Amino acid sequence: MKKLFYTIYAVIFRICRLFPVKRGRVALVSPHNADFNDSLGAVKAELERRGDYDIKLITRRDIELSKNPAKLIKGAFRFFFVSSYRLATAQYVFLNDNFMPLAYINFSPETKVVQLWHAEGVFKRFGLCSAPPPEIEELEKRCCKRYTHAVCSSKNVVPYYAKAFGL
């Protein structure tokens, strides 16, 4: 079922790619933390301080689907159409975790996709090093191919991040 949702997302994203990338548009994607009390929150605060950025948030609240029919329709519309458009037209995309629809989409060459990850350092296995089930590992590999940058806490951990994200 998830694969169907990812495929629908990708089709809508491709349509949204017909719109130009908007200079200064930044999409902050936080699929598991809607409060921005992590590295994405720091990026958001800095972008707001600098000004001149059109910040678009994509959080787990956009992804959650309700049992209430009206909320379900609104949530599905927001997830499939609004978040696809925001990603497709963003000049910069910052993520702090895996966002599996990335496995099915291709960004404009103008878009920079930055994985911040939600936990600095390498105290645990993460990304491709966490030995996920084969079907999840394949999705993660496809997601990682979309990253143009990954941020880590030190030069000393670059090899671990490179391995974890397949960079």
For the regions a language model picked out, list residue spans one by one.
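Active-site and donor-binding regions of nucleotide-sugar-utilizing enzymes
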Residues: 27-167
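Membrane-proximal basic amphipathic "stem/tether" segments
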Residues: 1-33, 74
